[in-house]
Amino acid sequence: MVAVSLKMSQPAAPPPPMGERARTRMLLALQSRGIHDPRVLEVMGALPRHDFVDEALAGHAYGDATLPIGEGQTLSQPYTVARMSQALELGYGMHVLEIGTGSGYQTAVLAALCRRVYTVERIPSLALLARERLERMGITNVRYRVGDGTLGWPEPRPFERIIVTAGAPATPERLKRQLEIGGRMIIPEGGKLNQQLICIQRTGPESWQRDVLEACRFVPLVGQQGWE
């Protein structure tokens, strides 16, 4: 596999009992479902996913299931994280906007695969926990904001990649405008319970190409240009 730096200044906490075996099973399951980007597999195999959930759930961290993280939010199943990360087609020099920090796990995956992550979380308590968690791990190439993610990053700037980790009724216009020409966005669109995972590529100043990747299920994207 390709060597990937996780940009950690401190070693990760040791995995729980059976953790290494569970990680191996997780990676094999991801590969069997079409995850082939060696960088994504390397990063997800190295990250201590159990550190992103309550201790009581640590034994379930590497199973292919969503897990609660509080405030009615969830940590996406490993396949979903891997699928979205792979679909972004990340480069190490890229700046990535993430809407929905959540536990910080997806943020950590992105941080290992690009130059800098700009992440927005609307729930202050989750944003604080995620920031503390990532800083403890020594991940330093992330900028954090608390606010309405449907409005994008507060300072106007283009991003090569945008990832949205909650289901939107439609793609927020502000996010479309913050995607640079030639850039790519991965976003779940649809109803509150079921969505389609969409890849949006900006092809010109006023043109975007949309492709449906697969069915998915996310918590609702709440905000001015999302759900109430």
From Swiss-Prot:
The active site is at 76. The keyword DNA repair does not apply. The keyword S-adenosyl-L-methionine applies. It catalyses: [protein]-L-isoaspartate + S-adenosyl-L-methionine = [protein]-L-isoaspartate alpha-methyl ester + S-adenosyl-L-homocysteine. Residues 1-20 are annotated as: Disordered. It is an enzyme of class 2 (transferase). GO terms for biological process: methylation; protein modification process; protein repair. Catalyzes the methyl esterification of L-isoaspartyl residues in peptides and proteins that result from spontaneous decomposition of normal L-aspartyl and L-asparaginyl residues. It plays a role in the repair and/or degradation of damaged proteins. This is Protein-L-isoaspartate O-methyltransferase. It comes from Magnetococcus marinus (strain ATCC BAA-1437 / JCM 17883 / MC-1). The gene is pcm.
